[in-house]
Amino acid sequence: MFIFQDCREGSQFTESGDTMIFKFEAQAPKIDEKAYAFNTATLIGKVELKEYASVWPGVTIRGDVNRIEVGRYSNIQDNSVLHVADKYACIVGDYVTVGHCALLHACTVEDHCLIGMHSTVLDGAVIGHGSIVAAGAVVTKGTIVPPNSLVAGI
């Protein structure tokens, strides 16, 4: 495990071979003992992985200026990025699948959703309960997707 004292202080760290976990401005990620993060995933700052959440190879979850939550039984697949904005946190509900190479930026994904591979969900967007965002789709800033919807295209 890489644990930096603070991202802004330089390269003080410890290594034990697991996930890269970084503090940011004294905020360290919180990982439930039943959650899993692959050893090439990077978790930074105000990040919480809840019970049975999983994070896979190459994922970056950066809670620097706001918080990120990954809900129970949710999975963030290979090379996806979750980030925040000053105004918006990034919240992933329970039982959510985020496909490979997706970008979730300062948005909310409610429970039981599927976010397709290479899709993008932007600031302030809300993906309603049980919805699907198709592979490659772009959900623009501030879009509210109703529950049980399918989103495709831009």
Question: Where are the regions a protein language model picked out?
Answer:
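Glycine-rich hexapeptide-repeat left-handed beta-helix
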Residues: T19-I31, Y36, G58, D64-D94, ...
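Compact, Lys/Arg-rich rRNA/RNP-binding cores from ribosome-related proteins
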Residues: A41
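A general secondary-structure boundary signal
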Residues: E51-Y52, D94
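Short, Lys/Arg-enriched N-terminal segments with co-localized hydrophobic residues
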Residues: I3-T19
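N-terminal glycine-rich anion-binding loops that anchor highly charged ligand groups
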Residues: I44-K50
